[in-house]
Amino acid sequence: KEKRQEEIDIMGEQDKNTALFAECKWTNEKVDLSILVTLAKHSRLFSYKNIHLYLFSKSGFTKGCIDEANRMGNVTLVSYADIVAYNLM
């Protein structure tokens, strides 16, 4: 494989076949599809069979991002509102 440097905010390995990759955005804009596409692309630089992607956002997600996350099936979207609601439980 080609050697490259890419920024990944969070990476965790469960075992030799499974890992998670995450991107965190603390902005006033919703996270759009391009962020998800970039994270998915960066995760493919590794040879894990099972990849789980997480996007964390202060301001939520665009419809395009939500639709693609649902289509992909291995993506979890977490907004700041989700975190606050979870902490209130």
Feature names for model-found ranges:
Residues 1-89:
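A cross-kingdom feature that marks ATP-driven nucleic-acid transaction machinery
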